[in-house]
């Protein structure tokens, strides 16, 4: 398949002075997908940075919900450009409404210590009663589940998602979300990094609820990501299998945290992600 809608969502139009317009990706009146906004914000920051440096971190704070059918404008501030590093600040708007504030860090790749942990598949205890399937390290052997609920921003014809949950309803809950973009993509590490941010925000706070036996799809809680942070360790290939291994170490006061490692198919950690979000019980 040739590059599809997801890649086109990251084709921003520069309107001058490090200001960019990003296309919408959904019906008017529906809530904009946070991963869409975060990925476009990172793409805007990348457009203002030299091609010799790659993103090392992106931090996005979601301030207001957006409209999925409305284009967004991203204003980038060049905070710092050093010999090997750069820093950018990004503000995201729809009209005059400020939707997000973020920062992105960049660096020229250099030599230094290199190590990685591996996904914790070897210690996982399968809960076949809950999942109906044994855990496997081969994503092709898992059923093609798609996201855990409706996700119009991630069309099934473009993104293959296979979710395997373990120990639901306990503090040891683990979500293993295998994903890949089913499209021909150019060898552009910036595009692949932005696509990783785009895809991995899907139901990003759900592990917070899953620890307690709930889900973002059951209507028991108002849940939404308020802060998304990603540290990029190595180049990501969005068009190959990637494993997002998610846990929730803490929740209190109506908020919770999801931490995750993003691994390539060989088990090497390519990124680390932390999402914070609201998880407020609905009054029946």
Regions found by a protein language model. Give the residues of each.
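Terminal targeting signals and extreme-terminal segments of soluble enzymes
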Residues: 1-284
């Amino acid at each position: 398949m040739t590059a599809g809608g997801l890649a086109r969502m990251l084709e921003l139009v520069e309107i001058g002075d490090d200001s960019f317009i990003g296309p919408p990706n959904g019906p008017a009146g529906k809530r904009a997908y946070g991963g869409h906004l975060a990925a476009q914000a990172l793409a805007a920051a990348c457009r203002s940075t030299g091609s010799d440096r790659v993103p090392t971190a992106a931090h996005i704070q979601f301030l207001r919900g957006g409209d999925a059918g409305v284009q967004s404008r991203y204003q980038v501030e060049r905070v710092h450009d050093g010999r090997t590093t750069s820093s950018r600040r990004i503000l995201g708007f729809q009209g005059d409404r400020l939707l997000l504030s973020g920062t992105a860090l960049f660096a020229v790749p250099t030599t230094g210590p290199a190590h990685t942990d591996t996904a914790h598949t070897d210690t996982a205890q399968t809960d076949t009663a809950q999942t109906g399937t044994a855990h496997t390290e081969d994503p092709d052997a898992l059923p093609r589940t798609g996201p855990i609920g409706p996700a119009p921003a991630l069309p099934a014809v473009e993104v293959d998602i296979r979710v395997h949950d373990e120990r639901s309803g306990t503090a040891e809950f683990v979500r293993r979300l295998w994903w890949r973009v089913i499209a021909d993509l150019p060898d552009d590490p910036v595009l692949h990094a932005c696509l990783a941010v785009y895809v991995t925000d899907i139901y990003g706070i759900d592990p917070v609820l899953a620890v307690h036996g709930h889900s973002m799809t059951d209507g028991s809680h108002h849940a939404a990501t308020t802060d998304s942070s990603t540290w990029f360790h190595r180049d990501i290939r969005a068009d190959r299998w990637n494993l997002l291994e998610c846990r929730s170490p803490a929740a209190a006061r109506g908020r919770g945290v999801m931490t995750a490692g993003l691994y390539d198919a060989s088990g090497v950690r390519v990124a680390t992600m932390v999402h914070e979000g609201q998880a407020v019980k609905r009054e029946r």
